[in-house]
């Protein structure tokens, strides 16, 4: 059994180390309304379509309770739409600064292509957002063969539709000849729901939530503890494999092929 394609996530996986572009904006749109949310809370739904992310935040019990304290009622769909529109407006202005490929990604992509592997991608960003990110990333040397956004399919993650559309456009089947790699719980669910080999990448991920500088300066024991927490979270949510850096991906691929593994 040969792996024929790899489907990559974007922010936190191939670009934007630590997935910081949307984080501050999510926190800001709530803070402006007198509702303080933590970075950990803001990251929890990461990987979803962004309006679904806003909605998921409003449904968290602590945030909903705080909103009720401030406004005397729970968030409405109108509130969600208003916050999402504000989120988009702010995010569009900063996205170009968060499109640089993560260290080592371009080299791994080049190596995969030398093997004849096709490169697809999925995202929680809208098509309009990705027009900005993909253009800037391409200028810096990263351009997958195909990109699918939630706008292109009936629903985003955790549904498998973006992966299926990649498979159709890349001409690869069955789905167990493909790997899905990402940095969030919703990525793991997307890959498993699509029937693909699913890999979670830890360093640079939204789930780890650390900048490169923080990783470099953190006590090794503390960093290892945080890495293992994320690793376990990925596995609990369906990851077949976890890797700390993208450079380990080809080893995983070779293991699948050599051992003739079967998705369970």
UniProtKB/Swiss-Prot annotation:
The active site is at 9 (nucleophile), 50 (schiff-base intermediate with substrate). Signal peptide: none annotated. Its EC number is 3.11.1.1. GO terms for biological process: DNA repair; organic phosphonate catabolic process. Its cofactor is Mg(2+). It is an enzyme of class 3 (hydrolase). Mg(2+) binds at residues 9, 11, 183. It comes from the Bacteria. Transmembrane segments: none annotated. Keywords: Hydrolase, Magnesium, Metal-binding, Schiff base. It catalyses: phosphonoacetaldehyde + H2O = acetaldehyde + phosphate + H(+). InterPro entries: HAD-like_hydrolase_sf, HAD-like_sf, HAD-SF_hydro_IA, HAD_sf, PGP-like_dom2, Phosphonoacetald_hydro. Binds 1 Mg(2+) ion per subunit. Belongs to the HAD-like hydrolase superfamily. PhnX family. Homodimer. Involved in phosphonate degradation. HAMAP family: PhnX. This is Phosphonoacetaldehyde hydrolase. It comes from Bacillus cereus (strain ATCC 10987 / NRS 248).
């Amino acid at each position: 059994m040969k792996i024929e394609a790899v489907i990559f996530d974007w922010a936190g996986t191939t670009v934007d180390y630590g997935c910081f572009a949307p984080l501050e904006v999510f926190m800001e749109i709530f803070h402006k309304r007198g509702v303080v949310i933590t970075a950990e809370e803001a990251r929890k739904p990461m990987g979803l379509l962004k309006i679904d992310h806003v909605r998921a935040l409003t449904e968290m019990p602590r945030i909903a309770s705080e909103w009720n304290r401030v406004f005397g009622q729970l968030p409405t769909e109108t509130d969600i739409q208003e916050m999402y529109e504000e989120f988009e407006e702010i995010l569009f202005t900063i996205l170009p600064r968060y499109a640089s490929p993560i260290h080592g990604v371009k080299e791994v992509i080049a190596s995969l292509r030398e093997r004849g592997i096709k490169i697809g991608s999925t995202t929680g960003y809208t098509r309009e957002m990705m027009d900005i990110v993909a253009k800037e990333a391409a200028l810096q040397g990263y351009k997958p063969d195909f990109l699918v956004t939630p706008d292109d399919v009936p629903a985003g993650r955790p549904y498998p539709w973006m992966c299926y559309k990649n498979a159709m456009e890349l001409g690869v089947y069955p789905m167990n000849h493909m790997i899905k790699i990402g940095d969030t719980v919703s990525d793991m669910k997307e890959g498993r729901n699509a029937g693909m080999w699913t890999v979670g990448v830890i360093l640079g991920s939204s789930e780890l939530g650390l900048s490169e500088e923080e990783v470099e300066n953190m006590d090794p024991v503390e960093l290892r503890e945080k890495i293992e927490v994320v690793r376990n979270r990925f596995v609990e949510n369906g990851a077949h494999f976890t890797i700390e850096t993208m450079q380990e991906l080809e080893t995983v691929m070779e293991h699948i092929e050599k051992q003739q593994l079967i998705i369970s």
